[in-house]
């Protein structure tokens, strides 16, 4: 398949409790191809991507008539040249070639529930399934810099497990249910308190040493008196 430089994507506009859909053309590449070329991704960006995809689906579901995307996968997500993340407009004729790629058996089997055709009626749970599979793909194909810690990894596993459990009694009714599992990136703060304690300890030690030096040395006035007394004793002996 020839690599296109641009795609028609969905632009979601939120206005109060309602969202609106429009379509626009952006220059970029499908997420699946982008991460093959850039497998090492800043952890901050990786977590922001996952949160952004969840948020985009949430906004889509709030649009008029509550539409669903139907087939979420790394080929249906476009990374623009500016670094933005968008869902492809699958109804746009310009994306027909990409749609044919996504219909291939090896891709369908990985990003759709077992035995389910891509044309099945769209639903929130199906969107959640595709998102869970896409996040699994991201984690498998990329290396976060710095690496995800055990807590972040555990939360993302819970998220994907919840997304993929299609037959649970607690099937996802609202995509926002999974947001609580998505870690928020936090810069590691320097240990200012520890450094302050170390500085205070050194200062206290210097004060103690200075005091010890003063105790061990006679006062200059005392040295003068001792010197004069010695001179008087020498005169008397003479």
Enumerate the language-model features and the residues they cover.
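Hydrophobic HxD+1 residue recognition
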Residues: 70-72
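Conserved HxN/HPN-centered segment at the entrance to the catalytic loop
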Residues: 2-17, 65-66
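Protein kinase catalytic-loop region centered on the HRD/HxD motif
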Residues: 54-68
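Conserved short submotifs of the Hanks-type protein kinase catalytic core
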Residues: 15-30, 34
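C-lobe/activation-segment region of protein kinase-like
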Residues: 84-162
């Amino acid at each position: 398949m020839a690599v296109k430089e641009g795609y028609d994507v969905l632009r979601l506009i939120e206005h109060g409790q309602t969202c609106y859909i429009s379509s626009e053309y952006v220059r970029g590449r499908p997420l699946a191809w982008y991460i093959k070329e850039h497998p090492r991704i800043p952890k901050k960006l990786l977590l922001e991507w996952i949160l952004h995809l969840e948020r985009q689906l949430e906004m889509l579901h709030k649009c008029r008539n509550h539409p669903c995307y139907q087939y979420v996968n790394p080929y249906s997500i476009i990374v623009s040249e500016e670094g933005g993340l968008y869902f492809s407009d699958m109804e746009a004729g310009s994306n027909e070639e990409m749609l044919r790629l996504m219909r291939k058996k090896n891709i369908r089997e990985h990003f759709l529930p077992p035995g389910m055709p891509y044309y099945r009626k769209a639903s929130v749970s199906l969107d959640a399934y595709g998102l869970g599979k896409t996040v699994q793909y991201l984690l498998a194909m990329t290396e976060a810099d710095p690496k995800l810690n055990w807590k972040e990894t555990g939360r993302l596993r819970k998220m994907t497990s919840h997304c993929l459990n299609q037959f649970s009694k607690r099937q996802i009714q609202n995509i926002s249910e999974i947001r609580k599992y998505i870690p928020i990136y936090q810069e590691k703060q320097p240990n200012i308190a520890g450094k302050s304690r170390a500085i205070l300890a050194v200062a206290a030690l210097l004060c103690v040493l200075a005091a010890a030096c003063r105790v061990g040395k006679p006062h200059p006035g005392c040295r003068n008196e001792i010197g004069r007394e010695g001179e008087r004793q020498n005169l008397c002996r003479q």
